[in-house]
Each structure stands twice: as structure tokens, then as C-alpha cells.
Amino acid sequence: PNVKMKDSGVEWIGEVPEKWEAVKISHIGKLTKANGGSKQDNVDSGISCIRYGDLYTTHEYIIRKSRSYIEEGKLDEYTAIQYGDALFAASGETFEDIGRSAVNLLKEDACCGGDVIVLKPSKDIDPLFLGYALDSIPSKYQKALMGRGYTVVHIYTEQLRDLIVAVPPSFEQKTIGIALDRQTARIDLIIEKTQRSIDLLRERRSALITAAVTGQIDLRETI
């Protein structure tokens, strides 16, 4: 960037613009361990419920739509979440993936299941920016170092408090969040179209092999 830079003081973040600050997430919000029941509580519709497994399979950076729901009568057994809250998966299979996170942008009532750590950020933190910052490469590197365990990897609130992110002024957070949202959406669309082309080419490849080895086409003249 064409701005004056400074050393963040954090090796894996490097230099940041002069007006940015590298801070522990415990300084920008409150972290708590969530409580919640099992997947057996899931129903087809009801209160949106984000489970730790959803953070690995469904939600990348941002939670825009729930895939799990519970009955309203079960809500007291779960941890309520609000718009802008960040959710971290507290357990996983690998150090590289531990602490996978996403920020809740659901505007309706919602909750989360167990094995989730919730960050309730201060009001001057933009949700979109936070979502991308918490699961960026520097953040993933730190979370991997914080992981504990072997067969199952865990990350705990006490370690996660020390996760450091680079935070710009509020107006820059909003601008960066919106820009990232638009540009990543374009990239995702290109990836989707490319994947469809790859899938089609694989189908044609398989069909060619099948036709050739069953005598349906003669490839001798192509040699």
C-alpha cells in the first residue's frame, strides 16, 4: 500500500499501516465457552443453531444462513448469539484447522452448540472485517500453535485470548470488509464455474475410456 508502514511487533503479521494496531482479541471483545446440546436436537425449522462442525463444513469467514435448527423450547440449553459475534470451533482433527471461525451475520434469533468459543466484539469492530481477519493465514498460524492434543485437537479460551489481529480504524474496517466481500464473491463464482468445467471434462474422459475398452469406438487411427 502507498502509505507509511510500521512494524507490528508480531513476526507472523509483519508490517502494518501506521494507523493500524496489532492487538489481542481479548482487547476487542469478550470470549466465552458456549454450552449446547447434541445434533439429536436438530429439527427441520426453528431457531438457527450453529454447531462446531458447521464451521468446518459450511461457514467460511461469514455465517449468512444456518443449516441447523432447534425447537424454541430447547433454546435455554444453548448459548444465544448476536449479530456480529465470532464463533470458533474448539475442537478438530488437525492443528492446521483448529479454531476455524466465522462471524454471525444472521439477523434473526440464533444460538450455537457446544464445543464453540464465542467472541462478542466491541461496537467499533466491523463484523465483515472481523470475519476475514480471524480466519486469515496469520490467524490460522497462531491458532495452530495454540492447539492441544493428538487424536483430537482442542483450543481453549485461555489460549485464544492471546490471538493477535491487525486492526485498522473503524472506517477502514468497513471499507475493507465490503471490498473483500465483493471480490471474494467474484472469485468464488469463477471457482464454481471452473469446477463445473473440470467435472465435465472428467465425465468425458471416463466416457472415452469406457467406449474405447468396450469396442464402441476405434482409436487406432488416432495413434
PLM features per residue range, with description:
Residues 1-4, 167-223:
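Amphipathic alpha-helical coiled-coil/heptad-repeat segments
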Residues 4-35, 162, 166-170, 174, ...:
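Non-catalytic DNA-recognition/assembly elements of restriction-modification systems
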Residues 8, 109-117, 148-175:
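A short glycine-rich beta-alpha junction/loop motif
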Residues 51, 73-137, 149, 156:
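A short beta-sheet element
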Residues 52-56, 105, 180, 223:
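Short, small-residue-rich loop/turn micro-motifs
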Residues 139-142:
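Periplasmic-binding protein-like
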